[in-house]
């Protein structure tokens, strides 16, 4: 299941803002960067009506895998897990989430990835237990 367009982070100014103004949560396989949404940055975007929505981007380095097929499979796996659990929780806050996957051999194991993804989601307070 793909992310809805209203939930996608776009634009280099958005990512610069997240890198500078975010809370960071570290795991062995990935890093979460969470920042409160800033509508001033998104004024130039077409989805201006969805400024206060929760937005997410998952960045997977080529260090994880040189093959785009593998990186896209991991990205879709994490997006799917997030959407299934995010829709259950009705208490959405206007945050921006950037997930950076680190290079590791254990990225081939879906269960470890999902387990750490879930751990960081709860650790960051995005979803409740």
Swiss-Prot record:
Q: Which Gene3D superfamilies match?
A: 3.30.230.10
Recite the UniProt keywords alphabetically. Endonuclease, Hydrolase, Nuclease, RNA-binding, tRNA processing
- List the cysteine pairs that form cystine: none
The EC designation for this entry is 3.1.26.5
Instruction: Say yes or no: keyword Transmembrane helix present.
Output: no
Query: What are the recorded GO MF terms, alphabetically?
Result: 3'-tRNA processing endoribonuclease activity; ribonuclease P activity; tRNA binding
Which of the seven top EC classes does this enzyme belong to? hydrolase
Name of a matching Pfam family = Ribonuclease_P
User: Which Gene Ontology BP terms does the record give?
Assistant: tRNA 5'-leader removal
GO CC annotations, alphabetized:
ribonuclease P complex
Quickly give the catalysed reaction.
Answer: Endonucleolytic cleavage of RNA, removing 5'-extranucleotides from tRNA precursor
| PANTHER family cross-referenced by the UniProt entry | RIBONUCLEASE P PROTEIN COMPONENT
Q: What does this protein do?
A: RNaseP catalyzes the removal of the 5'-leader sequence from pre-tRNA to produce the mature 5'-terminus. It can also cleave other RNA substrates such as 4.5S RNA. The protein component plays an auxiliary but essential role in vivo by binding to the 5'-leader sequence and broadening the substrate specificity of the ribozyme.
Instruction: Give the UniProt family note.
Output: Belongs to the RnpA family.
Subunit info?
Consists of a catalytic RNA component (M1 or rnpB) and a protein subunit.
Quote the protein name from its UniProt record. Answer: Ribonuclease P protein component
